[in-house]
């Protein structure tokens, strides 16, 4: 009882009325404060306000359903003291811990002490580690003005925009490929041969003046590119079919 000195308001829960006055006087002498009385069988019908007592002393520990209520009745950091309890101390300490008490200990073979946490039941506190670093937030902040959008049209070259020549997509009806079969009768063999001759003539065509790519205004009268639009130097140009045939 010496550990309870200075506690101003206590509650003594009794089971046996014999020598009750003597036990109450001992508690008053140890704490130096006021002591209220309550019968253990009437505790469930009591209506004590929360945080009413600094100390609660119980003569019997058969209060499995009332430990939480006692926790509410105690002030923050208030103490619960059990004497003359029945059953194993370890089992009783476990029940008290599960009810929310801390610092549960066995003072003697027939006495236990526990404490209510230093805050009111149901209270909340701000956690320091939950604060966010402002600089870290700004790093990941995305603004619509900062977005660099890519123009889809810039991803395509002029060559990509040109539609393919349907004639160049023709395939052999037998092989299913743009390659004539051995006994081609659909005309694909002649078409491929014409393209081959045209390509060969284009590769052999050379400019003596070096101005053929500029257009008809700069070309000779016998220029193979006469009548064709201007083109870039080194650009591959296909000559017309009329230039691939002999004049004689």
Swiss-Prot record:
One of its GO terms (molecular function) is 4 iron, 4 sulfur cluster binding. Coiled coil: none annotated. GO terms for biological process: iron-sulfur cluster assembly. Gene3D superfamilies: Vaccinia Virus protein VP39. Residues 209-223 are annotated as: Fe-S binding site B. One of its GO terms (cellular component) is mitochondrial intermembrane space. Its main location: cytoplasm. PANTHER family: ANAMORSIN (PTHR13273:SF14). A motif (Cx2C motif 2) lies at residues 220-223. [4Fe-4S] cluster binds at residues 209, 212, 220, 223. The C-terminal domain binds 2 Fe-S clusters but is otherwise mostly in an intrinsically disordered conformation. It comes from the Eukaryota. It is found in: Cytoplasm; Mitochondrion intermembrane space. Residues 130-161 are annotated as: Linker. This is Anamorsin homolog. Its cofactor is [2Fe-2S] cluster; [4Fe-4S] cluster. Residues 4-129 are annotated as: N-terminal SAM-like domain. Component of the cytosolic iron-sulfur (Fe-S) protein assembly (CIA) machinery. Required for the maturation of extramitochondrial Fe-S proteins. Part of an electron transfer chain functioning in an early step of cytosolic Fe-S biogenesis, facilitating the de novo assembly of a [4Fe-4S] cluster on the cytosolic Fe-S scaffold complex. Electrons are transferred from NADPH via a FAD- and FMN-containing diflavin oxidoreductase. A motif (Cx2C motif 1) lies at residues 209-212. Pfam families: Anamorsin_N, CIAPIN1. Residues 172-186 are annotated as: Fe-S binding site A. [2Fe-2S] cluster binds at residues 172, 181, 184, 186.
């Amino acid at each position: 009882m010496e550990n309870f000195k200075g506690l101003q308001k206590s509650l003594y829960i009794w089971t046996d009325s014999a020598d009750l006055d003597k036990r109450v006087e001992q508690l008053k002498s140890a704490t130096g404060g006021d002591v209220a009385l309550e019968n253990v069988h009437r505790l469930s019908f009591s209506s004590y306000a929360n945080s009413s007592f600094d100390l609660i002393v119980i003569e019997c520990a058969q209060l499995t359903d009332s430990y939480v209520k006692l926790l509410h009745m105690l002030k923050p950091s208030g103490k619960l003291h059990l004497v003359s309890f029945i059953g194993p101390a370890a089992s009783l300490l476990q029940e008290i811990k599960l009810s929310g008490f801390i610092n549960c200990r066995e003072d003697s073979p027939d006495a236990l002490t526990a404490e209510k946490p230093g805050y009111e039941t149901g209270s909340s506190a701000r956690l320091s580690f939950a604060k966010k670093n402002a600089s870290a937030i700004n790093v990941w902040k995305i603004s619509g003005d900062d977005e660099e959008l890519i123009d889809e049209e810039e991803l395509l070259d002029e060559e990509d925009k040109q539609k393919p020549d349907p004639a160049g997509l023709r395939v052999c009806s037998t092989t299913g490929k743009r390659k004539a079969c051995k006994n081609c009768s659909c005309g694909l063999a002649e078409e491929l041969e014409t393209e081959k001759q045209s390509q060969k003539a284009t590769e052999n065509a050379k400019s003596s003046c070096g101005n053929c790519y500029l257009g008809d205004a700069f070309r000779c009268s016998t220029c193979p590119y006469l009548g064709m639009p201007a083109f870039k130097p080194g650009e591959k140009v296909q000559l017309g079919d009329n230039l691939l045939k002999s004049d004689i």
